[in-house]
């Protein structure tokens, strides 16, 4: 029983794509992507923020193993995580934009609340 979406890619490509999407979301605060990619990105980004809320060295190393930029990790632990300290989950919001012109894929904006 799979608990994730395959997104039409082999596992290494899918994992790196999702790592890049999560890094971009944490770096910029919002990104525009397809609906299914956003739902997978939300799942992983919320885990990273929850780890950052713990704030210990082990959590920092776990986040560093997933997020691709060290500056984003520093920003996550110093600025983003304290903002959500009293919130239990639900750190992201997905807003629908409508279909993409080329292939009618459902486009959304995913952003940090």
From Swiss-Prot:
Asked if the Swiss-Prot or TrEMBL record annotates the protein with the keyword Glycoprotein, the reply is no
UniProt keywords (A-Z) are: Ribonucleoprotein, Ribosomal protein
For this protein, the record's InterPro entries field holds: Ribosomal_bL17, Ribosomal_bL17_CS, Ribosomal_bL17_sf
One GO molecular-function annotation for this sequence?
structural constituent of ribosome
Does the record bear Ribonucleoprotein in its keywords? yes
- Please cite one Gene Ontology biological process associated with this protein: translation
UniProt xrefs under Gene3D superfamilies: Ribosomal protein L17 (3.90.1030.10)
Disulfide pairings: none
Q: Which Pfam families does its entry note?
A: Ribosomal_L17
- Under the cellular component aspect of Gene Ontology, which terms does the record hold? cytosolic large ribosomal subunit
- Share what the entry says about its subunit structure, partners included: Part of the 50S ribosomal subunit. Contacts protein L32.
NCBIfam families noted in UniProt = L17
Query: Which family does the record claim for this protein?
Result: Belongs to the bacterial ribosomal protein bL17 family.
Q: Which PANTHER family does this UniProt record tie to the protein?
A: LARGE RIBOSOMAL SUBUNIT PROTEIN BL17M (PTHR14413:SF16), RIBOSOMAL PROTEIN L17 (PTHR14413)
Name the record gives this protein: Large ribosomal subunit protein bL17
């Amino acid at each position: 029983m799979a608990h994730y979406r395959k997104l039409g890619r082999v596992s290494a490509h899918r994992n790196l794509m999702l790592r890049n999407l999560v890094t971009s979301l944490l770096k910029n605060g919002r990104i525009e992507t397809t609906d299914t990619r956003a739902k997978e990105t939300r799942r992983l980004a919320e885990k990273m923020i929850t780890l950052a809320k713990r704030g210990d060295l082990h959590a920092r190393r776990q986040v560093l193993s997933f997020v691709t930029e060290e500056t984003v990790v520093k920003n996550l632990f110093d600025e983003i995580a304290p903002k959500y300290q009293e919130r239990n989950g639900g750190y992201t919001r997905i807003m629908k934009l409508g279909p993409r012109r080329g292939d009618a894929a459902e486009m959304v904006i995913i952003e940090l609340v």
